[in-house]
Regions:
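Mid-domain Rossmann-like dinucleotide-binding core that forms the NAD(H)/NADP(H) cofactor-binding site
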Residues: 142-204
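Glycine-rich beta-strand-centered segment in the early N-terminal region that forms part
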Residues: 23-41, 53-104, 108
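Short, compositionally biased
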Residues: 101-117, 194
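Residue-level marker of beta-strand positions
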Residues: 86-87, 127, 171, 191
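Short N-terminal binding/cap micro-motifs at the start of the first secondary-structure element
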Residues: 10-19, 44-46
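A structural motif shared across PLP-dependent enzymes of the aminotransferase-like
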Residues: 96-104, 118-132
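Glycine/charged-rich beta-loop-alpha catalytic/anionic-binding loops adjacent to active sites
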Residues: 134-144
Length: 204
């Protein structure tokens, strides 16, 4: 298959990224599915993986990417076959530690927190495997729009709902409204009935 492969770490990431041949993922194990990628989205995490993440040892070459939309074309043994043919998006967090307190989100720097596209090969490829528990059916949504949903909205949701427990009428200050997480936060604030206030260097 074809994949966007990061050959090595370096300060100028694009010089070390190329479209290249890569082995297809193996047959999915129990509880997993293989996804044929329709669209994958860039995230700032891709730059961190390309430049190197302090304290995290990564092997290269590797495939980046944590956000994607695709069609399930294979499932593992004893896995619900009704997933086949469904268009899905991905929660890239394949391993999450228990929260210190019930209302706390899992820490993204805990030793057992793992992401496709960071700790494991990612989704900037024609195919990838993922646990079905990490996939969400998204019918009738433009794959290009759906692909960009995952990390940004999950980060914003964890911050607003899991951690801050935002309620209708709460004021929420969002700085740097042009970014992906900030835009996701704005949309979630509206959905939650909160009262967002945004800042930007751009005069609108």
């Amino acid at each position: 298959m074809k994949a966007l492969v990061i050959s090595k770490q370096g300060p100028i990431v694009h010089e070390n990224v190329a479209l290249a041949d890569w082995p297809e993922p193996p047959a999915p194990p129990t509880g997993h599915a293989r996804v044929r990628t329709l669209c994958s989205a860039l995230n700032h995490l891709d730059l961190w993986v390309g430049k190197g993440v302090p304290g995290l040892k990564l092997s290269y070459p590797r495939i980046g990417g944590s956000d994607a939309c695709g069609i399930i074309d294979a499932v593992g043994p004893d896995t619900d076959a009704s997933w086949l043919g469904k268009q899905v998006i991905l929660n890239a967090a394949t391993a999450r530690p228990a929260a210190p307190r019930p209302d706390d989100p899992p820490s993204p720097i805990a030793a057992d927190y793992e992401l496709l596209g960071e700790h494991h090969n990612g989704v900037h490829a024609q195919f990838f495997n993922a646990p079905v528990d990490n996939l969400q059916h998204v019918p009738n949504i433009d794959p290009a729009h759906a692909a960009a949903f995952g990390l940004t909205f999950l980060t914003a949701y964890s911050m607003l709902v899991t951690k801050a427990q935002v309620r209708p009428g709460h004021f929420v200050l969002i700085t740097g409204i042009g970014g992906g997480v900030a835009t996701a936060t704005l949309n979630l604030c509206v959905a939650l009935g909160a009262r967002p206030i945004v800042t930007s260097r751009q005069q609108w």
